[in-house]
Amino acid sequence: MFRFAVLFLTLLICFAALSCQSYSTGLQQSLARADETAATGTLHTIATAQQTYALTNGGNYDTFQQLCEGGYLDTRFNSDKPVIKDYVLSMEVGRDSDGPFFRLKADPADNGTKPGRHFYIDQSRMMRVNASQPASASDPIAQP
């Protein structure tokens, strides 16, 4: 009888340990999804700021710093690569044969240690996503 009690107790401890690991993994994934939600919301906000800026500036787009100076974005964005909720934002603005453009990316701040997808948006306002590397215009559209 004692052996069965020890075996039962051992199995119970193993089950509890596995449950804790599963719970911890779930929490990490939840935090990553919350950070992703903040990042995508921020990208949409910046894209809206760019569209508004373009309306009053000949259709041109501008940098984070210029958008902040003009009051289109708050001071959190007043750098070349602002960091929002563990995502590093980067933006390219310019003009090509199709006219003015902006390309905005959000990449996880710690690629190797934290889960997170990479996001991209441009003047088309289509959010694109890549699970393993910085996203671009050729990546699939992000699904809700």
Q: What name fits each language-model region?
A:
Residues 7-17:
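Bacterial N-terminal signal peptides
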Residues 18-52:
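Amphipathic alpha-helical segments typified by the pilin-like N-terminal helix
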Residues 28-29, 48-115, 121-127, 131, ...:
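Extracellular/periplasmic head regions of type IV pilus-like filament subunits
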